[in-house]
């Protein structure tokens, strides 16, 4: 089968396209003939970890965690799926290929009306945003949340979920041309990362108070400034929480991290429980149903061929996509 591999770690991760043996099907696994692969934020993070020697590439080298397609094989212990079922599946690695195996517990049937692109992009984004924002982050009506890199896949879903809580939402966009598209999902307070004085504008929009919650999808951009905008006792969610903000002063007065008073709560953008947890699985299923009904939007910015994986990753990092990027084998 055709697949995308990660190699060349000593000189930085290199994505290459080639052939690989078909994956082995364990008793609790589902074999999926892939229709569309989604490139998730967690995939980008893993490449960064490989680059810095903080993690090893997966056995066999095939990267990617999520894809939609059709069930082509089932393990002996699988009970919820049949051959031919349309599904989306999540696993630690192996999705960037024509065939993908994933545990039954982290595989979902596609709700009627859900297109394969939105399906491929759904599980991780839905689980990570919901858990970070609503479960661990406890965002409430009347609070103010600032979303950095708001046009990312995670940023766009965070906008929608935050608005549903009744919170005030401010977004920082790298591409000012996206304003009209952001307004269509309900965001009205939009700051330009390149044209606006973000600190001054946020303080203006909050009458000098600052924000209760920062949801930072960037790779550490503006961390020091954004932490200063969080009120004491507020929350800061990011991918590299410990490294990027543990030592940052926070609050309008620039309190030291060990200062007396309410601490800044630091949250990783992730699910507290694994994707195969029954509660996570159920929540993702409900939210996918909402996407199928048009109640939530999960935009797909561009589709690449699987053999163009290197270009697809580069597009995400430098092309300012609005939402997800997917690949077709």
Residue ranges of model-derived segments:
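N-terminal glycine-rich beta->alpha transition that marks the start or flank
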Residues: 11, 20-68
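A glycine-/small-residue-rich N-terminal strand-loop-strand element
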Residues: 47, 68-91
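NAD(P)H dinucleotide-binding glycine-rich loop of Rossmann-like/cofactor-binding domains
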Residues: 86-149
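Short amphipathic alpha-helix with an adjacent loop that forms part of the alpha/beta core around
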Residues: 197-208
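Glycine-rich phosphate-binding loop and adjacent beta-alpha segment
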Residues: 221-295, 329
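C-terminal capping/lid region of NAD(P)-dependent oxidoreductase domains
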Residues: 289, 293-299, 310-329
């Amino acid at each position: 089968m055709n697949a995308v591999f990660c190699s060349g770690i000593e000189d930085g991760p290199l994505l290459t396209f080639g052939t690989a043996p078909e994956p082995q099907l364990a008793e609790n696994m589902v074999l999926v003939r892939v229709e569309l692969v989604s490139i998730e934020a967690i995939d980008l993070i893993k490449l960064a970890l490989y680059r810095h020697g903080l993690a090893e590439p997966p056995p066999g080298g095939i990267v990617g965690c999520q894809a939609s397609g059709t069930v082509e094989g089932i393990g002996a212990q699988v009970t919820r799926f049949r051959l031919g079922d349309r599904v989306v599946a999540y696993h630690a690695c192996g999705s960037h290929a024509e065939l993908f195996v994933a545990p039954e517990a982290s595989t979902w049937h596609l709700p009627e009306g859900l297109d394969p692109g939105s399906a491929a992009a759904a599980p991780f984004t839905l689980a990570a945003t919901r858990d970070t924002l609503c479960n661990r982050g406890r965002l409430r009506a009347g609070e103010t949340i600032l979303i950095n890199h708001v046009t990312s896949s995670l940023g766009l879903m965070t906008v929608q979920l935050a608005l549903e809580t009744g919170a005030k939402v401010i977004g920082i966009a790298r591409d000012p041309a996206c304003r009209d598209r952001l307004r269509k999902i309900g965001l009205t307070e939009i700051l330009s990362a390149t044209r606006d004085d973000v600190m001054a504008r946020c303080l203006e929009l909050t009458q000098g108070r600052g924000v209760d919650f920062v949801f930072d999808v960037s790779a550490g951009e503006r961390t020091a400034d954004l932490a200063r905008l969080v009120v004491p006792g507020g929350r800061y969610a990011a991918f590299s929480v410990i490294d990027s903000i543990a030592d940052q002063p926070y609050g309008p007065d620039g309190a030291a991290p060990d200062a007396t008073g309410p601490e800044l709560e630091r949250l990783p953008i992730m699910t507290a429980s694994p994707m195969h947890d029954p509660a996570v699985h159920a929540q993702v299923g409900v939210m996918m149903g909402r996407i199928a009904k048009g109640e939530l939007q999960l935009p797909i910015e561009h589709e690449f061929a699987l053999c163009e994986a290197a270009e697809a990753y580069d597009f995400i990092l430098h092309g300012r996509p609005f939402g997800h990027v997917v690949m077709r084998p």
